């Protein structure tokens, strides 16, 4: 399938969402803390609403999975996966590392991914089998083959944080540069563009990673569970890399 209409709707949804993001960014707004200690802002809710409305107008019978509302199951082969604002903590503190993530899954495959970070002027898009692009330029993962001085970004959630920090000790004593920027979409873009060599996630949700996964894979990267098995979006722990370092990093994580 070519997914031409789906691609057009995805891009329009991104444009609509970006306008709301920009309207709220840097402004004081209502903030709530969810049960899992993450934040939700008024901007999250409005961005979520406009993306859903844009998609539903074109595809009323498609499934929609989003962070900020219940799963809309229409028993369709098509599922839209939405994170209206990834990096909400950054967003509400006016840190520009935050943005919008929308993906389309057809049956078992993520076929389209769109990440927009308006405060950083980043517009990323990928289609399965057709490459990954940032601001219209094709991107690719790094060519690094050795662990020495490689850059690994990581993601920790609030739940069982101590346990997850223990997992990072696998990298202690190694010449690896560990970084965390507070937004999964940015971490995935860093790997997809070759600015980081790998990304380790110890707890996540499908909407955090779906769009970024197709970007990484189309840029030549590799994704697996942190035990090396083939991944599913229902998993919560992942290793994402340039592919060349994947085996070496898995060996560290399996210790």
Model features per residue range: what roles?
Residues 1-85, 244:
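N-terminal subdomain of lithium-sensitive/metallo-dependent phosphomonoesterases centered on the IMPase/IPPase/PAP
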Residues 74-133, 150:
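DPxDG-like acidic metal-binding loop motif
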Residues 32, 72-74, 107, 125, ...:
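Solvent-exposed alpha-helices and their adjacent loops that cap or buttress functional pockets
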Residues 140-255:
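An extended, acidic
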Residues 17, 21, 44, 55, ...:
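Residue-level signal for inorganic ion chemistry
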């Amino acid at each position: 399938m070519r997914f031409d209409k789906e691609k057009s709707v995805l891009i329009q949804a991104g444009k609509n969402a970006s306008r709301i993001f920009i309207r709220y960014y840097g402004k004081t707004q209502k903030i709530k803390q969810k049960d899992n200690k993450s934040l939700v802002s008024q901007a999250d809710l409005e961005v979520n609403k406009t993306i859903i409305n844009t998609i539903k107008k074109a595809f009323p019978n498609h499934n929609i999975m989003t962070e900020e509302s219940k799963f809309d199951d229409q028993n369709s082969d098509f599922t839209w996966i939405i994170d209206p604002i990834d990096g909400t903590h950054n967003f509400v503190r006016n840190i520009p590392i935050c943005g919008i993530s929308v993906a389309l899954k057809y049956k078992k495959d993520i076929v389209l991914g769109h990440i927009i970070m308006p405060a950083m002027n980043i517009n990323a898009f990928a289609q399965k089998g057709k490459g990954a692009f940032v601001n219209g330029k094709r991107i690719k993962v790094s060519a690094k083959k050795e662990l020495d001085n490689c850059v690994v970004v990581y993601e920790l959630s609030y739940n069982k944080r101590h346990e997850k920090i223990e997992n990072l000790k696998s990298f202690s004593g190694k010449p690896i540069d560990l970084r965390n920027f507070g937004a999964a979409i940015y971490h995935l873009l860093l790997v997809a563009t070759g600015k980081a060599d790998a990304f380790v996630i110890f707890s996540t949700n499908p909407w955090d990673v779906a769009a970024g996964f197709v970007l990484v894979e189309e840029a030549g990267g590799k994704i697996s569970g942190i035990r090396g098995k083939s991944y599913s979006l229902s998993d919560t722990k992942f290793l994402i890399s340039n592919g060349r370092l994947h085996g070496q990093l898995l060996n560290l994580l399996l210790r």
